[in-house]
């Protein structure tokens, strides 16, 4: 859906991770931020690209949690292993780089979205940093694209 909205509106959509969600929230933010930093270095800007490390990690964690009922009772290392294995990132590489400045700056930048998440829940869409779309009122992808286009012009 995001690539279709980007194409139709000419806007760039950025995904944020909310570290307040889930037991391993900060670890998740650092994992996703590291994947995004590596994607950017590889020239991958489309987060739906099958080569995107972010997509691979995100999809693996989503599937494990929502489809398989995984709650990672074995701890943070097991949680991280799910995303790292899917993205093909060695655990020692991640451990060495998870606290680097680029990763921390990106993960910290997502904290501004917490208040939006409290209002809308997830996923939440904010247009140009000003307009929060209440997704419960959206009836179709085309309706969402049209609304985003209108809000972007304001």
Protein language model regions, located:
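Solvent-exposed, acidic/flexible segments
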Residues: 21-28, 50-54, 72-77, 87, ...
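Structural alpha/beta surface segment adjacent to cysteine/selenocysteine redox centers
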Residues: 1-74
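C-terminal cap of thioredoxin/glutaredoxin-like
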Residues: 81-154
């Amino acid at each position: 859906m995001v690539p279709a909205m980007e194409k139709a509106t000419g806007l760039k959509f950025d995904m944020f991770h909310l570290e307040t969600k889930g037991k391993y929230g900060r670890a998740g933010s650092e994992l996703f931020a590291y994947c995004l930093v590596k994607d950017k270095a590889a020239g991958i800007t489309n987060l739906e690209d099958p080569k995107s490390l972010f997509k691979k990690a995100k999809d693996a964690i989503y599937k494990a949690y929502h489809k398989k009922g995984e709650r990672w009772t074995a701890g943070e290392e097991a949680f991280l292993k799910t995303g790292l294995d899917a993205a093909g990132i060695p655990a020692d590489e991640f451990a060495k780089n998870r606290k680097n400045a680029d990763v921390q700056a990106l993960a910290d930048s997502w904290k501004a979205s917490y208040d939006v998440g409290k209002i809308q829940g997830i996923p939440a869409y904010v247009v140009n940093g000003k307009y929060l779309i209440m997704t419960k009122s959206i009836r179709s992808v085309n309706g969402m694209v049209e609304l985003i286009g209108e809000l972007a012009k304001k």
